A protein has these predicted regions:
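Hydrophobic, Leu/Ile/Phe/Ala-enriched alpha-helical segments that form helix-helix packing faces
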Residues: 13-16, 99-107, 209, 268
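Short, high-confidence coil segments that cap the C-terminus of an alpha-helix
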Residues: 36, 105-108, 215, 271-273
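Conserved acetyl-CoA-binding loop-helix of GNAT-fold acetyltransferases
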Residues: 85-101, 252-266
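Aromatic (often tryptophan-rich) hydrophobic motifs at membrane interfaces
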Residues: 205-315
Length: 319
């Protein structure tokens, strides 16, 4: 692949209005530190599909992995107008087979990608020896009607919100970046694991997103000024994405995270947001918390392929 591919990909994105934010060149520049490339599927010199990717070093091997703080990547297809269903399926298969063959030529030790939930088929990858795991996100798609949204929450969540609204909590958008990050890391520390992304990763992405007015930082504090919970959101047109959320373990019993999420949903609705995507999670405790807000469960696919037996062994050993 060459820099010409990146330039063509940038042009492709400019001509593709429905390109998801996590496949936009500015996002890729931020998460990959500009060290990324793109596979391009063409018919008659026209780009119909693209698949950006970046290389990572892990356990001493070169891999292609899902970038940090990025819920989905994978491919995107610019479907021609008035395409018959059978031709749409055929285009998906041809594009996926092409990308699978190109990745096979690159031959990383391991390949992994999370596809956008709009893709319901992975046959082109399946026929080339790739594996698939179904994951789940939750999405609010009726934010124009907050009464309906509230009615879909569990009884416990509705009671909790009503109770907390009477208490002296304040939502801030100006918490210093370092403090915001450190509150989030407390969630991982409680579980005895390291935060999967560094402050530098977060700082770089926030700088790029804030420059485009596409990020929002929320922190909920009590009357003593203690920060109970934080949530980081990326906004893309009428779709908002939750990127991460964390709470101070010593203050978790306040349930302030519930009130914070409801505040964010109300603000998203006020900004004419049509969809709020929680972007996960398959972790039981997180899934339970999100599910009780009554959002729509939406499956999406993780595609992967192991090329190195030694890498696979080390990966299993580490986990």
């Amino acid at each position: 692949m060459t820099n010409a591919n990146k330039q063509e990909y940038r042009q492709f994105c400019e001509q593709t209005p429905d390109m998801p934010v996590f496949l936009q060149p500015w996002w890729l520049d931020a998460v990959y530190c500009e060290d990324w490339d793109a596979l391009l599927y063409k018919e008659k010199d026209n780009i119909l599909a693209a698949m950006p990717y970046g290389r990572h070093k892990k356990y001493g091997f070169t891999t292609i992995l899902q970038p940090k703080l990025t819920p989905t990547t994978g491919l995107w297809i610019a479907y021609p107008e008035n395409l018959k269903r059978l031709n749409r399926y055929a285009l998906e298969i041809k594009a996926m087979e092409f990308f699978a063959e190109q990745i096979d030529k690159i031959k990383p030790a391991y390949f992994q990608s999370m596809l956008h939930f709009s893709f319901t088929s992975w046959l082109g990858f399946y026929w080339h020896g790739y594996k698939q795991t179904t994951r789940y996100t939750y999405r609010f798609t009726h934010l124009e009607d907050l009464d309906y949204t509230f009615s879909q929450c569990s009884t416990e969540v509705r009671k909790c919100i009503r109770k907390l609204e009477k208490q002296d909590f304040t939502v801030r958008n100006d918490l210093p970046l370092k403090q915001f990050y450190e509150i989030n890391t407390l969630t991982y520390a409680r579980q005895g694991v390291k935060c999967p992304f560094s402050f530098e990763d977060f700082e770089r992405i926030e700088a790029a997103a804030a420059a485009r007015n596409q990020s929002r930082r929320y922190a909920i504090c009590d009357k003593e000024g203690r920060v109970h919970s934080v949530t980081y959101v990326i906004c893309s047109g009428d779709v908002w994405h939750s990127i991460f959320a964390g709470s101070d373990p010593e203050l978790r019993s306040s349930n302030a995270a519930t009130l914070l999420l409801w505040h964010i949903l109300k603000e998203a609705s006020a900004c004419s947001c049509k969809e709020y995507n929680f972007n996960g999670s398959v972790m039981r405790s997180i899934e339970t918390f999100i599910r009780h807000f009554g959002a729509e469960q939406t499956p999406y696919m993780m595609i992967e392929k192991h090329y190195s037996k030694l890498y696979s062994f080390l990966k299993r050993l580490k986990h």
